[in-house]
Amino acid sequence: MITLTKEDGPADLDGVTHLSIGVSWDPTGGASGGIMGVLRRKAGTDLDLIAIAMQGPDPVRLAGLDSLDPMGNGSLVHSGDNQTGRGDGDDETVTVEFARLPGNVTSIVFVAAAFKKGSSFQKARNISFKVYDATGGSSQQVADIWPSLLTQDNGCAVAKAVRVGGSWKLEVVNVTGKIKQGDEHALMRFAISK
């Protein structure tokens, strides 16, 4: 397994028919100690993994939040909303089946966001993005992408899958920014700027 960075440049996805990206995090009490820290850790925090299908510069479909199969054909599927970060493994996952994507989809931007009011990256620890080759029905982790822990932002454009002719490439974006919480248009504007 490798850890992908922006400096690595785009990775060829030749032979990869199904790609999954997962996000996991651990809840934290933030800077609160004592009873407040215990209560915050117990409540957890809600980060969201969102995949935005692009047609050139325009967002055309969003997988995540309450939209689990926006194409309606299983080509871009979200696992569902984990609102606490508790449990083992990935808390949320998006899976792409490249051959079933409509031809007008030119790229997919994967974004993690503390999107709902009251959630923040500061209330999560050990945020990790995992990339899986899910070809053939079994998922094999092929890479990790780790965002900076120093951000005060609430959004991270993690990676972007780009159609190049008849194949796809995956490039690490790993850029953070501020997104107005609860505003899907702000989320999409953030994604298309990457």
Regions found by a protein language model. Give the residues of each.
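Intrinsic-disorder/low-complexity signal
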Residues: M1-S107, V111-K194
